[in-house]
């Protein structure tokens, strides 16, 4: 193969692109760079080679197999455009000389189409289950060459380029190929490696857009930087086979589920000499500290507030832009995977908060991604969320539907996540959510329901059940939408659980009343049992209840210091014995006084005080009882698992009920929500003999007054509360007793 710098009979106009093509190339407006760059046959067995490398001093062609230099490409009148004609057609390298050195690599424009037709078809259909291995930046070997395959969806763009340090962020250097009709742009850049930072430069209908981060990025730079990062394939030595194989049974509805909700960046932090936060812990550091703590307290699961990358820390992760990348704040994707691995080996499940409802308007993100409303609705009456100043995903678009579905599966399958708590479901279900008349667009039937979001949620739950057996999908849903946790086959949304926001609001409103007024609010604490079996519920005391002036959980409690702690212990005991799975936000388990602040760690120093240590001990004992006593968890979603004994003693603010296991073993719960000890208070029970006191929230081990029944009581043949037998109990002030018949 020899270089022909006089074209040897080939017309010079065939060597050069047309003036129109050159102009579009220089202006970075060419929609099809592969049509003019790279190798092109001359019809006689030879090839034209063209390269556009603005800033290059010279370019020559090297035989890839022999290393022989075949000759230079001619510099043209257009700076940066180099052309040449070669006889024969063999693989080649480009040797490019820059002001700062020399580079030898394959020509990105010498490679054929990259993505398979089936991948593109499934993506367009919204049904690609492993999109995180298809789009985005993927380390690949193409035609024996290692490098990175970039692929991004931008169907309305006129041109898309990959930019990064590797091309000095010059959008003219690596324009991409459009794959019709999917709207996906692709390019393979040889010899690029993991760790490279990159973005996309997109030319929209009205000009160049702000540089965009990759919607499919698997890793990111550390905020406030906003670049995406080329990630290596996950290399995690999974040692959680026992956990994963037993997960379906462990997460059945009749199993205990006690969730510790936390914010990874503010649970514990490294402090400086002044006690201020010096830095947030990484996943390995958190694993070392958090896992033993959660294990000791007896929670079955942790729930992490969103750990996907988000630009603004003050959003707590709920305004995220990287649906596939763990935040760089806490380490690498591999470190997060190892954190999950360690949790599973310790017998702790991991649930992630996941946000498919909305996304922030940051210009480097999804907003107007290709110059049009691509991921969001175009009409602000549909696409703008007034409460949060965010944009709403257009889940009616198949590609967006599939994008969010793939995100869910990415966490569940690649990171072995045990469940997703879907944020803000109510805002997804209703088109008029938080909107006044005239501020929303009805659905195609004229109604207020968001039919696209409903279809998405049902599809999500069906797909998760198929692709990640045993994984939980939990709805934070605050309205009375029917059938949230009913199967899709029965017309429901198909969630495993729904947060019981009604119970949370009513019970907190009750417990904040001065005990002297609680008689007038007696039904607030019992009303939850009217609808307790309409859904499968989780009882949530979440981060939302301890911020924005709502006070911490203990600071909501009325009375002096002693009464506040007694009320808190009674409330937690009530919660743990009430039908429904449990969720408690970090800090509540030891009675942190101040509201949660995402910029500070929890007030761990409080544990030097007996009252705080007592609350922590109580939570540990409640979790142990909850796990050990089938009556407290087996029939959470069945009316036969609960029986009122006393629900109408408003004057004394006393409640009593039985929880039943499937084999007919009861647990008795008696609650006194006044500071007045009740001596010889009679409670009807179904079985004769001694009833053992399993827990007294007023015990001295919890820093209570230790008023009680000496560890148990014997029944008397005195009928009471519809039972032939009864117990005469001493009810401690602001406390809950849990008893069980001795066998």
From Swiss-Prot:
Pfam families: Alpha-amylase, Alpha-amylase_C, CBM_48, GlgB_N
Active site: 423 (nucleophile), 476 (proton donor)
Gene Ontology CC, one term: cytosol
GO biological process: glycogen biosynthetic process
Top-tier EC class: transferase
GO terms for MF: 1,4-alpha-glucan branching enzyme activity; cation binding; hydrolase activity, hydrolyzing O-glycosyl compounds
SUPFAM superfamilies in the record: (Trans)glycosidases (SSF51445), E set domains (SSF81296), Glycosyl hydrolase domain (SSF51011)
UniProt-listed CDD domains: AmyAc_Glg_BE, E_set_GBE_prok_N
Pathway: Glycan biosynthesis; glycogen biosynthesis
Alphabetical keyword list: Carbohydrate metabolism, Glycogen biosynthesis, Glycogen metabolism, Glycosyltransferase, Transferase
Swiss-Prot/TrEMBL catalytic activity: Transfers a segment of a (1->4)-alpha-D-glucan chain to a primary hydroxy group in a similar glucan chain
EC number: 2.4.1.18
Annotated function: Catalyzes the formation of the alpha-1,6-glucosidic linkages in glycogen by scission of a 1,4-alpha-linked oligosaccharide from growing alpha-1,4-glucan chains and the subsequent attachment of the oligosaccharide to the alpha-1,6 position.
Family the UniProt entry places it in: Belongs to the glycosyl hydrolase 13 family. GlgB subfamily.
Self-association and partners: Monomer.
UniProt protein name: 1,4-alpha-glucan branching enzyme GlgB
Species assigned in the record: Pseudomonas fluorescens (strain Pf0-1)
